[in-house]
C-alpha cells in the first residue's frame, strides 16, 4: 500500500538533527520509496532554511530506495535494501552528484509472538566519484559501514500496536557505534 510519513531524530547532545518526509509504495514484498532527508551533520554544509534545495548550500538530500522482503512470498526472514541519493548535498569535488548508494541485508534470527531479533550488514559506494574524492561517498568510504543488531518488542496497549525497538549499529569505516531507541506511535 501507499504510505506518506514523517521521521525525525536527534542525538543526546543535539549535535545531530534530522527531519524527513517520505512517500513509499509496497506490493507483494517490494517497496519503492522516495525520502527527503533534511539533517545537520557536523562537518557538512548546513542551511537553517528548510525550503533551500540549492545543491551547494542545502541540508537536504533526496533518496530513492527499493527493497524486497523475502518473507512475504518465500517465508524466508530476509530483507534486501538499496538506496541511492539522486539530488541534494551529495556532491563530488567537481560539484556533481556522486549518487552515493547504501545497500543492506537484514535477517531475522529470532521471532515469536512478542519479539523479533534481526541482524544486518550494510555497505556503501558511489557511482560518480570525482577524481580527487579518493573513494569517498556521502556516508564515508566504499565498503562495509553497518553491522547491526535490532530487537523489537510488539507492545500492545489495549487495541493499539506500538512496536518498541532498540537498534545497535557499528560502523567499521568510521570506527563508531550508535544506539537507536524508538517506538512506532501510530501508523495508518
Pin down the residues of each PLM region:
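Transmembrane beta-strand segments that form the barrel wall of outer-membrane beta-barrel proteins
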Residues: 1-12, 32-40, 49, 76-90, ...
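Outer-membrane beta-barrel "beta-signal"
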Residues: 149-151, 155, 175-188
